[in-house]
Amino acid sequence: MSRSSSSMATVLVVLMVVSAGGLSPPCAAAAKEEKPVVVLPPAAAPGEAPSADAAAFVRSCCDTALQADRDGSSFCYYHLLPYAAFFEGNQVKVAEVAATILSTNLWVYVDQLRKVQGGAGKGDPNLNACVDDFSVAAGENITREALQSLGRLAAAGNGKRSKEDLENAQKWIKGVEKPYNGGIGKASGCEIGYLFTYSDDLPAQKTLGYTFDTASSLINHIKL
């Protein structure tokens, strides 16, 4: 090969390397935060009532799980009634749908917190802590694992359910509960009660407690 041909080949190799590098994302680029992908079963159409047996089953599940909380039981019932036809007498399916709804509402709430964080709540350390804690609680990996575990528990049936799957779901719901109890880490100052200042900008907070109690109570009533 001539010197000129060799030089040309070298230039082409360099160009190919540079071009390939230009097509790749920079190493320092931050990974995009992903929200968990959750799918609810079809809900009844507005005005469409479930069968009496299906409605009675939802009522029974809610009354049993939230027997000491009449308001919570009522919220649970009307919250889950649109999915009554899906449950087919399976209590774990009820818990699975409640958890799916909670995970969706958590991300709505986190989005609202972040908007306040960039506006009226800028510089508020308690708000910052709550954003951090609820973001961790609603994280993609732990949420996906919990919902997958609930799906397996629902499919397995009584006496065949995995203790590990139940523990995964319980671990997730305990993680969601932590921001209500003063934060996740020792240095965290998340106190949800102090967020009342921003209540007009946090509409999801109005029902988040009931949504959490519904999912938590139903998950903790799952029998292996």
Swiss-Prot record:
Main localisation: secreted
GO molecular function: enzyme inhibitor activity
Keyword Ubl conjugation annotated: no
Keyword Secreted included in the entry's annotation: yes
Domain of life from the UniProt record: Eukaryota
Record's GO cellular component terms: extracellular region; plant-type cell wall
Biological process per Gene Ontology, one example term: plant-type cell wall modification
Positions glycosylated per UniProt: 141
Entry keywords, A to Z: Glycoprotein, Secreted, Signal
Coiled-coil portions: none
Subcellular location: Secreted
Signal peptide: 1-30
Protein name in UniProt: Uncharacterized protein Os08g0218700/LOC_Os08g12160
Taxonomic lineage: Eukaryota, Viridiplantae, Streptophyta, Embryophyta, Tracheophyta
